[in-house]
From Swiss-Prot:
Annotated protein name in UniProt: mRNA-capping enzyme catalytic subunit
Domain notes: The N-terminus contains the triphosphatase and guanylyltransferase domains, whereas the C-terminus contains the methyltransferase domain. The N-terminus is involved in binding to the termination motif 5'-UUUUUNU-3' in the nascent mRNA.
Requisite cofactors: Mg(2+)
Residues that hold S-adenosyl-L-methionine according to the record: 554-555, 578, 603, 625, 683-685
Annotated stretches, region: Triphosphatase-guanylyltransferase: 1-544
Coiled coil regions, renumbered to chain: none
Residue positions of the active site: 266 (n6-gmp-lysine intermediate)
Site (Essential for RNA triphosphatase activity): 80, 110, 131, 164, 166
UniProt keyword annotation of Repeat present: no
Subcellular location, record wording: Virion
C-alpha cells in the first residue's frame, strides 16, 4: 500500500486538466461553431461507487449503439455514429442489421490533437479532441471495418463541466451476422463484460473563466462522487487482502492442532488497509477501491501498517484490527496491546478497536465445546487463529451460514428490450448464477429478484439499483450493471452485492466468484452441525454424499490409458463412424426442434466428442463419468473451445457420477432440473456397466431422464462374437510398431467378461462385460426402448470408402479437408493389418424411446 500513498491526489489531476484547458483556449484564435473542442480527463476502471453517486445527481441517462471506424488515411481520427436504443425493437438484432438500420451519411469525425498521460497513473489520461460533422457515404460497403458497441451513459451537466459515466459493451464488427454478435448475447453472457469509464469534460462556453472557478466546480463535483475532497483521494489498483481466511470444515475441527490456537467472533465488516505516517492516516476500504486520507490528532512516531475490518455506526468508523503488519510482531496477542497503547484517540471519526478472544485449548474437545457455545451468541460465526508461528499468517472461519460469492447476470429475452417479468404477485427480474470454473463462467442455477422497494431496474442504462444495504458499510443504495458479483446464502437467497468482488470481476479476467469446488465444499459443510463432529454416523453420511457410491465398479479406480498415446488407423476409422452417427442423429432428420437437442453423455471420458456435438448444433450437454482425471480433461477441452468470443459452445455440465448409481437421476437434476433428454450418447462405455446386477438401475435411470422419441446411441464390441472366443485373440493394428506393441488382444475370462489390452495406448488390461445383441434388445424393450438401427463398423466404412477416396478430395474447407485426408491415410495403413476385421466386430446400436 505504501507505494500508492506517494502518488499525487486526485485534485492534482484536475489541476492538470484545467491547465490543459487554458492552454487549448489560448491557442484557439477564432471559434468555429461547426467544431466542438473537447478537453477531458478520463479515468479508466473507476470505483463502482462513483456510478451510484453520479446517478443520484444525474441530469441525463441514456443508451445507444455506437459505430466507430478508424480511417486508414487519417491517423488519430475516428468516424462515429449512433442509434438510440429507443429506435431498436427487441434485442436479437445482429451487427450487420444494426449497420443497415443507420439513416443518412452524416457521421461525426473526431480528431485527437493531444493526449497526455497522468505521470503516476496509467489508468488516467487527458485528451484534447475536435469533433465535427463529415460525410461517410460508403459505410455499408465497409461494415467489416466498423466497430459496434452498446454504450450506456449516466451524465451530470453542471455550469462549466460535464461528467459522464460510460459502460461500453463490445459487440464486434458491422459485418458479423452470427448469434454471438448481437445485443442479446452481449447482455446475457457473463464473459461479455462492460468497459467502464468516467469522464470530466470542461465546456468551451466561457473562454474567460478563471482557473479557480473551474477547480472549485471540479473539486465540488468530485467530492460528491468520491465521498471526500479530491485532495484526500488517491486512485490505485485493487489491493489484495493481506490475510486469507479459509473455511474450516467442521469434520476437520477435531484434527486441528490446538497449540497457540485462539478463537474470536466474526464480524461482517469491510476489509481495510490502514497506513499511518506521522499525522497522515491513509485508509483503503475495499468496497470503495481507492485510498482516503485523514489527519491524525497527534503525530505518530513510527510508521504503522494495519489490516483491519471497518464498520460504520452513525458517523464513526470503527476499525477492528486483524493484523499489525508494521512494526513486525512475532505474537499476534501482543498486537492487541500495541493497538490500545498507540492508536487510542488519534482521530475523532476513526476508532481503532480489537476483539476479545478465547484460548488456548488443552484438547480438541475443549475447542469444539467453545466453538459451539460461542456460535449460540454470534450472528456471523467465529474466527480461529494461531498467535504465532508459520500458521499465524492464515485465519480460519466457521460460519453459521456458509455463504458463497457468484456472478449474477440478469436474463434478457429475444423480442423484449426489458428483462422484467410480470405475474399475479408483481414484477421481478430473472437471473442466472455462475460459479468460477478455473477462469471460465459455469452456470450454476437461476433465481429471481422481486422489484419491490429494495430493488429497481433502470431500463435505459441496463443497470439495477439495490437499496437498504447494510448500514455498516456506509452505503445505503447501490447502482450496478446487470452483471455483478453477489453473496448468496446456503439456501440460495441473494444476501447482498459484493462491491469489491464486482470490481474484480469487471476489471480483471477470469474471475466469476468462488471456484465451483469451493462452493461445493461450503454447501456440504453446511449439512453438519458443530456437535456432529463426534458422531461417526453423521460424518459417514457426509462422506458418502461427497464420495461416489460405486462399490460394484468393474475395473478398480486408476489410470488405464497412456497420456502420450498416438491414434492409429483403428482409432481414426472408429472416430469416422462416431462422427457420422452423431451427425445423423443430431440432424433435423430426427430432431427438427432446436429446443429439444439436449444430450446426456454417459461415461463421456476425456471429452473427445465435444466438437462433434458442437457441429451437431445441440442446445446443451450433461456429461457424467466416475473418473476425476477424465472429468478434468473434458472440462479443460470444453473451456479451450469455448474461450473465444466468436466460439459460443453449447451449455456443458460435467458431473462425477455413474449410470450404475441410484443417485444418478438426482445428480443430473441438480443441473437440468425437470427437463428431459432427447439424445443419449453411450459410446464405447456400455460394456463397463451392462450386467444383470445393474440392469434395473441403469434402465430406470435412462427411462426417467429421457423424453419420448429420445435416441440412445451405443457403440460396443459384438457380444455374440466375443461369446465364441476360446482363447486369447490378437489383432495386428499398427504394423510400424514393434511386436510387443502393435496389437489389440481380447481374452474371454468367464461367461460374462472379456479382458481387452492394447499396449500402444493402455498401461494395463481392462475388463469389459459381454454385451449380447439379443440381451441388449430384450432389456431395452422391457423399458420401452425399441431398436431402430444396427450395423457393424466395417459395413459403414465399406459404404464410405469410395466417397473418402474420391469426392471428398474436392473439399476446400480446412478442417473438413484434413478430416478426410486423415481417414484416407488410415485406410492405407489398414493394409497388412487386422484393423478392418476388428472393425467388423464393433457394433452400432440405436434405440428410440417409444411414446
Amino acid at each position: 500500500m505504501d507505494k500508492y500513498i506517494s502518488k499525487t491526489p486526485l485534485s492534482c489531476y484536475f489541476e492538470e486538466l484545467v491547465d490543459t484547458f487554458i492552454s487549448v483556449v489560448n491557442s484557439i484564435n477564432k471559434v468555429d461553431e461547426s467544431k466542438h473542442h473537447e478537453v477531458e480527463l478520463i479515468l479508466f476502471k473507476p470505483p463502482i461507487i462513483t456510478l451510484t453517486n453520479l446517478y443520484n445527481m444525474a441530469t441525463t441517462t441514456e443508451s445507444y449503439i455506437e459505430f466507430t471506424m478508424l480511417p486508414v488515411d487519417k491517423p488519430n481520427t475516428k468516424f462515429r455514429n449512433r442509434i438510440p436504443l429507443s429506435k431498436i425493437h427487441g434485442l436479437d438484432v445482429k451487427n450487420n442489421q444494426l449497420v443497415e438500420s443507420l439513416d443518412g451519411f452524416i457521421w461525426e469525425e473526431k480528431s485527437l490533437l493531444l493526449k497526455k498521460d497522468i505521470s503516476d497513473n496509467s489508468s488516467a489520461i487527458i485528451k484534447y479532441s475536435i469533433e465535427e460533422k463529415t460525410l461517410f457515404v460508403d459505410y455499408k460497403r465497409r461494415n467489416a471495418s466498423i466497430k459496434l458497441e452498446l454504450v450506456s451513459v449516466v451524465r451530470a451537466k453542471l455550469r462549466n463541466i460535464v461528467i459522464d459515466f460510460k459502460m461500453k459493451y463490445f459487440l464486434g464488427s458491422g459485418a458479423q451476422s452470427a448469434n454471438s454478435s448481437s445485443l442479446l448475447c452481449a447482455l446475457n453472457h457473463p464473459k461479455n463484460k462492460p468497459s467502464l469509464y468516467i469522464e470530466f469534460e470542461i465546456m468551451m462556453q466561457d473562454k474567460n473563466i478563471s482557473k479557480k472557478k473551474l477547480l472549485e466546480e471540479l473539486n465540488m463535483s468530485a467530492s460528491a462522487l468520491f465521498l471526500s475532497h479530491p485532495k484526500y483521494i488517491r486512485l490505485c489498483p485493487s489491493i489484495n487482502p493481506i490475510l486469507r481466511t479459509h473455511l474450516l470444515k467442521k469434520q476437520d475441527i477435531i484434527n486441528i492442532n490446538t497449540d497457540d490456537l485462539y478463537i474470536t467472533s466474526k464480524t461482517d465488516g469491510i476489509f481495510s488497509h490502514v497506513y499511518i505516517e506521522k499525522k497522515s492516516i491513509f485508509c483503503y476500504f475495499s468496497h470503495l477501491g481507492y485510498i482516503k486520507e485523514y489527519t491524525a490528532s497527534r503525530e505518530i512516531e513510527e510508521t504503522i501498517y494495519l489490516y483491519a475490518e471497518m464498520r460504520k455506526e452513525e458517523s464513526i468508523l470503527y476499525l477492528t484490527v486483524i493484523k499489525v503488519l508494521k512494526p513486525c510482531m512475532e505474537d499476534r496477542l501482543s498486537e492487541l496491546a500495541f493497538v490500545k497503547n498507540h492508536l487510542t484517540g488519534i482521530h475523532d471519526r476513526l476508532v481503532f478497536v480489537t476483539k476479545c478472544y478465547d484460548g488456548p485449548f488443552e484438547s480438541s474437545s475443549d475447542l469444539v465445546v467453545s466453538i459451539e457455545e460461542m456460535l449460540k451468541t454470534e450472528q456471523e460465526g467465529i474466527i480461529l487463529f494461531y498467535s504465532k508461528g508459520e500458521d499465524s499468517t492464515t485465519d480460519y472461519k466457521v460460519k453459521k451460514d456458509n455463504t458463497i460469492d457468484q456472478c449474477v447476470n440478469v436474463i434478457y429475452r429475444y423480442m423484449s428490450s426489458e428483462p422484467i417479468v410480470f405475474n399475479d404477485k408483481g414484477s421481478f427480474l430473472e437471473y442466472k448464477r455462475y460459479s468460477n470454473d478455473k477462469g471460465f463462467p459455469k452456470e450454476f442455477s437461476t433465481g429471481k429478484l422481486d422489484l419491490n422497494g429494495s430493488v429497481e431496474y433502470i431500463n435505459n442504462i441496463y443497470c439495477i439499483e439495490i437499496k437498504h444495504l447494510n448500514p455498516c458499510t456506509g452505503i445505503t443504495n447501490l447502482v450496478l450493471p446487470i452483471k455483478f458479483i453477489a453473496e448468496f446464502s446456503h439456501n440460495d437467497e441473494l444476501i447482498q452485492p459484493r462491491i469489491d468482488k464486482t470490481m474484480k470481476y469487471l476489471y480483471e479476467s477470469g474471475y466469476y466468484g468462488n471456484q465451483l469446488s469451493v462452493i461445493m465444499d461450503h454447501l456440504n459443510d453446511q449439512k453438519l452441525r458443530i456437535g456432529d463432529v463426534f458422531e461417526e454416523e453423521k460424518l459417514a453420511d457426509i462422506a458418502a454424499h461427497m464420495k461416489l457410491k460405486d462399490s460394484m465398479r468393474l475395473n478398480p479406480d486408476g489410470n488405464y490409458f497412456l497420456s502420450n498415446r498416438v491414434r492409429g488407423a483403428l482409432g481414426i476409422l472408429s472416430n469416422f463412424v462416431k462422427t457420422l452417427l452423431i451427425s445423423l442423429y443430431c440432424s433435423k432428420t430426427y430432431l427438427d426442434n432446436h429446443s429439444k437437442r439436449k444430450v446426456l453423455a454417459i461415461d463421456f471420458g476425456n471429452g473427445a466428442d465435444l466438437e462433434k456435438y458442437f457441429y451437431g448444433e445441440i442446445a446443451l450437454m450433461v456429461a457424467t463419468d466416475p473418473d476425476d482425471n477424465a472429468i478434468e480433461t473434458g472440462k479443460k477441452r470444453y473451456n479451450e473451445r469455448n474461450a473465444g468470443d466468436k466460439s459460443k459452445y453449447y451449455k456443458f455440465n460435467y458431473i462425477k457420477e455413474t449410470i450404475r448409481s441410484e443417485t444418478y437421476v438426482s445428480s443430473i437434476r441438480q443441473v437440468l432440473y425437470f427437463e428431459k433428454f432427447s439424445l443419449v450418447d453411450w459410446q464405447f462405455a456400455i460394456h463397463y456397466s451392462f450386467h444383470p446386477k445393474h440392469y434395473s438401475t441403469i434402465m430406470t435411470n435412462l427411462q426417467e431422464l429421457t423424453e419420448s422419441g429420445c435416441k440412445v446411441l451405443i457403440t460396443t464390441m459384438d457380444g455374440d462374437y466375443l461369446d465364441t472366443l476360446k482363447e486369447k485373440k490378437k489383432f495386428i493394428i499398427r504394423k510400424l510398431l514393434p511386436e510387443t506393441e502393435n496389437y489389440l488382444s481380447i481374452e474371454k475370462i468367464d461367461d460374462d467378461k472379456v479382458l481387452v489390452y492394447n499396449p500402444s495406448s493402455m498401461s494395463k488390461p481392462m475388463a469389459e462385460y459381454i454385451v449380447r445383441r439379443d440381451t441388449l434388445i430384450r432389456v431395452f424393450r422391457e423399458y420401452k426402448f425399441k431398436l431402430i438401427d444396427s450395423c457393424n463398423f466395417k459395413t459403414i466404412i465399406d459404404r464410405n470408402i469410395s466417397f473418402i477416396n474420391g469426392v471428398s478430395r474436392l473439399e476446400s474447407r480446412g478442417s473438413t479437408k484434413n478430416f478426410f485426408e486423415l481417414n484416407r491415410k488410415a485406410l492405407e495403413e489398414c493394409n497388412d493389418t487386422d484393423v478392418l476385421e476388428l472393425l467388423s466386430h464393433y457394433m452400432v446400436y440405436v434405440f428410440s424411446k417409444e411414446v
